[in-house]
Amino acid sequence: MLTDTTRSPYAKVHALDGMKVKWTGGLWKERFDTCANSTVPQLKHMFDSKDISHVVENFKICAGDAEGDFDGTVFGDGDFYKWMESAIYTAYQTDNQLLKKEIENYIDLIGRAQQPDGYLSTKQIIGERTGNGVSRMGDINDFEVYNFGHMFTAACVHKRITGKNNFLTIAAKTADYLEHLYEEAERTGEVQTAVCPSHYMGLVEMYRTTGDKRYLKLARQAIALRDSVKNGMDDNQDKIPLKQHEKILGHAVRANYLYAGVADLCLEEEDPDYMEVLHKVWRSLVDKKLYITGGCGALYNGASPYGYFFDHQLVHQAYGYEYQLPNITAYNETCASLGGVFWAYRMFQLEPKAEYFDILERMMLNTNLAALSLDGKRFFYENMLRRAKELDYKLIWPLTRSEYILSYCCPPNLARTIAQSSEYAYLTSDNSVWTGMYGASEAQVKLENGGEFTLVQSTDYPFDGTIRFTAKDVKINAPVHLRLRVPGWSAGGSIKGAGADRELTKEDAGTYLDILVEDPQNMDVQLSLDMKVRYTVANNMVEETVGQAAIERGPLVYCCESVDTHAADLDDVYLDLNAEFTPVEFEIQGRRMMALETEEYTIDRSEFDRNALYQPLKYHGMSRKHVRLIPYYAWDNRDYGEMRIWFPVAYTV
């Protein structure tokens, strides 16, 4: 499983083993199948290719299977370990015998590439041999410890799913190397904060997998050493001591990984100060810096909003000021919202509040799924909320998805998360089953009282709000509590079955219903959520969206592409608050989804100079034209064109 908190003393709920939960239909089944059949093989080809990524070739050079120099990115090792996770999950979920064998071959290669002292970073190993001046731990931007962290996590996943120790043994040797490194850092006071601290989560998972308390101590030590960094910066969240953190800032991936790691530590050790930090920074994100799509990190490159003239204040791929949420230039790195998922998931296990899964689901169904093309072969590194026909400036990344870019961290991170997505469906505590992300599924549940049954969820969510729960293969003679999440966006609905029949109220939104099922053998509980189309407006401090609204239905954010309207330009479309939306089944590239058909106002801008900075206002009236909205996750899978989520509202008196 992704995180094994079954023995974590401060976990209120625990994840089900991912191999015991399977999507059986609907959107998540389709996305998992696409990941297994298309994305994982595509990424394998990229990593195997000497000419594209050079990643596997670097391991071969370290192992003595090939000759040559290091090539590719410094974080390629870690990205490959992330792909290994996706491969392990999909191979064993689908019983892919060939992929299982290839995984073991890769593990053998990784083991032979490792140095006798446990060190394993291909750039440095090759550099030591060629004498090109590259040194171990000489530059935090070489991502060595980031690579270690993803190795730790992949090795734990491999052990839990296969029962084999070969990958875990390699990871343990590297953890031993890291232990000596931190002991030396404490002795000398020479401390650097590792960028993108995946190793916090990785080390805690090593402890959970092996029971060796050295790894938990090492995670605590690694986090505490942040406070000893000299010349820290907001970009790396180490300018001030961790326990003084109140705002989310700096590089968004690094921030979300940091707080996910701290949450992992808090699941194992009580620390009220760290919990206070987690609460403050979470509120900073959710209340003032999170995009409607669940995207994290508004800025490309710039200066920290909280920096001073003489401070280290450069930031990149970062959170900005409160309410600084541009649309065309929204950065929203895919790895950042994935990190937000990891963080929210751990926070939920600390305190099972519906908000954490509301945010997790928003990130997963909108930004994260949008980062992958419907055919599973092309990726967004950054996730804009608006695309214009053309820009007068050049952004770092392409405005459409790419099969491969040099900075390839997001695709394997996305692949492993989709491969593991069924783990976000259910959690358990005592004699309770808690729902996380909804989707048609079957879960083999074993409760702490020894009771076992298969929980069957039947639904077309997120396109339909009716969710039915039944049970089969029941081996329990005691009541079961079904804890059902009512998302914060659901203003109504109903619950039926188990003697709990009633209409839902506004007070139920954003809470868990506790449904006592006295006879699990005859379980039949139906939750119906309000799926009315919603107009959503932002705080007026979000300057780019003043006077505008977005359209949501259920957990999905909707957008419009230029191909789906007869307007000359998407900027000409204004929302009519009296317009009716008709949900209709729609397909793009053979993938089924629910679109919204409507008529909206379009303004006549025939005399408008779209190249002028300023010009006299000319109004020639409005007309009504057909508009189709599609789920944001499905955009950029047809012809290139405009896209936008936020539209000006045509208020009437």
Describe each PLM feature range.
Residues 1-653:
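Glycan-recognition and catalytic cores of secretory/periplasmic carbohydrate-active enzymes
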